[in-house]
Amino acid sequence: MKFFTASTLFLLAAQSLNSGVSASLSDPANTPTILADDIVHGYTPATYLSSVPTLLKRATTSYNYNTSSASSSSLTSSSAASSSLTSSSSLASSSTNSTTSASPTSSSLTSSSATSSSLASSSTTSSSLASSSITSSSLASSSITSSSLASSSTTSSSLASSSTNSTTSATPTSSATSSSLSSTAASNSATSSSLASSSLNSTTSATATSSSLSSTAASNSATSSSLASSSLNSTTSATATSSSISSTVSSSTPLTSSNSTTAATSASATSSSAQYNTSSLLPSSTPSSTPLSSANSTTATSASSTPLTSVNSTTTTSASSTPLSSVSSANSTTATSTSSTPLSSVNSTTATSASSTPLTSVNSTTATSASSTPLTSVNSTSATSASSTPLTSANSTTSTSVSSTAPSYNTSSVLPTSSVSSTPLSSANSTTATSASSTPLSSVNSTTATSASSTPLSSVNSTTATSASSTPLTSVNSTTATSASSTPLTSVNSTSATSASSTPLTSANSTTSTSVSSTAPSYNTSSVLPTSSVSSTPLSSANSTTATSASSTPLTSVNSTTATSASSTPFGNSTITSSASGSTGEFTNTNSGNGDVSGSVTTPTSTPLSNSTVAPTSTFTSSGFNTTSGLPTSSASTPLSNSTVAPTSTFTSSGFNTTSGLPTSSASTPSSNSSIVPTSTFTSSGFNTTSGLPTSSASTPLSNSTVAPTSTFTSSGFNTTSGLPTSSVSTPLSNSSAYPSSGSSTFSRLSSTLTSSIIPTETFGSTSGSATGTRPTGSSSQGSVVPTTSTGSSVTSTGTGTTTGVTEVTETSTFETTEIITSTIEPTTASGTGGGNPTAAPTNEPTVTTGTETTEGTATYTEPTTFTSTFSFTTTIIGGTTTIIPVNPGNPSSSVSAPPTTSFTPGPGGSGYPSYSNTTQGMNTTSIWNSSNSTIVSNVTATITGNVTITTGDLTTIDPTTFTSTYLSSGFQTVSNTTATSGSDDDVKTASTSSSTSYTSSSSSSSSTTSAASSKASVSMGLNGLMIAAVILLVA
């Protein structure tokens, strides 16, 4: 054990959650350490925010919204597993009394590897790796099975199909599509991509294949890509596999024959994993597999990625993308899956899940799994689907669930392109079992269930249940089991089923269930924001030897020897569950130092109307001008957020500002972040007799336009004093023989700079809490020290708080007006009489004068925004251990005649950390709270409303503003995000602040980015309750 003074802040490796938050230590001299003791007593991250009266979330932006994001987002799941499972290369079974057994060949694309084909013994019309087989499709050899630095790599791909008393058994062509196994520094790595289908009294059994995973630093790792599907007394069993992480090819397109004996089929297509696009602005959408089936055809199509079921199965193992299962074995000990696709079993010792989409069924009418977009229609000639939204047909025992699609971003636009949060539909007379995003389930009497990267799983009466990210599911004796996360569909009696975004399927009058699993987020290197994805929520439970969680994926184990996943390590064996409601906003700032946010903060405007890619056209008019700043007044146009094309604006106005010489105008207010600025035209007449500038309506676009509008105007009249034309609305200053000929002027916006700062101040109101548990008792005699321990204590604290702030937006514009004037003065003609000959009249030519006048100026205005928020929070800490260690016993011969008392009292004003006292008789004691085995649940919601006040000259307008703050408590770190949006007549402003706050409770500390260690706090108390010292106890 080591003791450190209270001024020492122990920082446990802070992790950046792809949000641009960087960790740094607070100044130990000014930032007191937050003790775990405090945490235990209900002081959530939100509570400690309260102790910082002023959280400066300050930032400025140049308004090109280049918020920085520290997300390099490679979806490579690094598996540090040595001697991981060796997967079987293929599955084959025999066929008897089968009317038709169509076994299209599986072409496996391998490079520099040995290709082994599976054996299909006693199989009628079964060919493996036959070049003449039906619909043999293989993909480009270059992008498949790329094995980097992998020696002794073996890739086998095979396909076998068998059927017993089955009307039809169709196995689509399996190409070891997108079977890109990137194995870095991996020796003895084997990748097998195989396909097997087996059916007993099954109408249809369809399986497809494949997919892959990236493994880093894995030795003796075997990746089983693609597996087998089996069904007992099941009407339909369809599986598909998931495409690999960086696969740009479309995953496998199977075809099935027509005029085949009718059979109810269910197919599932899968999600394509994330793709990376270095130069393209938009992420590529990965059309992962598009199967087709023709009329009256027994269609069994499968695309990419998938899972299956097993009954009394010995083993279910999956290393990368895709699970496998076997029929008729028992007492299996192991099931491990890493990336992509899960599975579950009944009466099996194993249930494993991994990344994308799983599912199983026993005596179930239907069990289908997929990943990304399917579709159905009833008696339709054609069914086409692009993206989300599922449909199911009538009178079928169908269940469909869809979850959200991860948003995608492009480089030039800061706002996300779109994100449709799915909408599942299921039709009448269907028995429905629906599972949404990140919802796991199932296996009975299973000994082990382990999940890793994305994709979950749980069990019944099993020792372990693990859940992760994506969406799996199983069913026992159920009519339907459906899982989804993105969009599915099926078709009944359909001639054609076509899907744009990966996968369709068809079936005729079958009891069908379709499941779709989430699409992995897409990233491109130059994109500022990550595509999506909730950054994990780790869970671990008691008595576990090891529980580590990764970035974006958690895991649990009970009485398990080991449960491991990649990155990020939760503290101790504690179970930490966090949830928060609210919106985190579209932009993230980089927070560093002691709280000052440096980076991009943009301030807010208007409520965005949906995620449209094209903004509607808006028109508005206004007149008048601000005589102080020279900026035009205008009617506010509410720009649409997230549009890639700015609306077109038209406007007219007249009049001129005699002070600044700037034209009055109705301002064209282009949407923020638009790449196209509207073009405006206007005309006016008259001239300013003081400055000699023409009056005009000026196009004054404010905000972030990349192209300034072009303006033209004409005027007439001329001023004889200055030689400038007089306007039609002004009286010439004198009588003269001069008159104007023509005049023209141009107005150009040279530059515009917009800065924004938001300075919220957060204060927390009262907090209250209580501690319960078993009071420890102890005694001491003749110099002995007897520590006592209590367990099961719990603390609950609640509180309210407010957030107020002021946002100021200042814009400075530089403009230039150039005028070209041409003036003509006619000569005077004279005549006279006299003696003799008459005098000839003068013959002078007209005098033409041409001149140019340029006026430059600068205009600045500031727009203040104020807001106030109120929120409440509740924190509950359950479990944990309190140990009281007697310190410096009083009378060595005395004993404790009464048990110590423990109390929990909020600190001064409810904003500090609590005082925690233990008082015994006859001795001083030190109380140590062990946060291991404790559960911390923190929920904080905040709703903020306010107004934006805009003052331009003598005109003041107030626009409604909505702010949303989210406080997420996880472990010993708090992440606070505030987003403000206001409606302005000038531009779109969105202010977003983000801070990461540790458990520091000092009024002088401002949102630091540190993470406090999982430390134990001990407080020494005397008989009189006086605090002697505070220390941090670290267990070496």
Swiss-Prot record:
GPI-anchor amidated serine lipid attachment residues: 1011
GO cellular component: external side of plasma membrane
Sugar-modified residues: 66, 97, 165, 201, 233, 259, 277, 296, 312, 331, 347, 363, 379, 395, 410, 429, 445, 461, 477, 493, 509, 524, 543, 559, 573, 611, 626, 642, 657, 673, 688, 704, 719, 735, 918, 924, 930, 933, 939, 947, 977
Polar residues composition-biased segments: 586-595, 631-647, 693-709
Gene assigned in the entry: pfl2
Compositionally biased region (Low complexity): 243-585, 597-630, 648-692, 722-831, 838-862, 885-906, 990-1011
Record's protein name: Putative GPI-anchored protein pfl2
This protein's record includes keyword Glycoprotein: yes
Gene source species: Schizosaccharomyces pombe (strain 972 / ATCC 24843) (Fission yeast)
Function, in words: May be involved in agglutination during conjugation or other aspects of colony formation. Induces flocculation when overexpressed.
Region entry Disordered, spans: 88-130, 147-183, 243-710, 722-862, 885-918, 978-1011
GO molecular function, one term: cell adhesion mediator activity
Alphabetical UniProt keywords: Cell membrane, Glycoprotein, GPI-anchor, Lipoprotein, Membrane, Signal
Extent of the signal sequence: 1-23
GO terms classed as biological process: flocculation
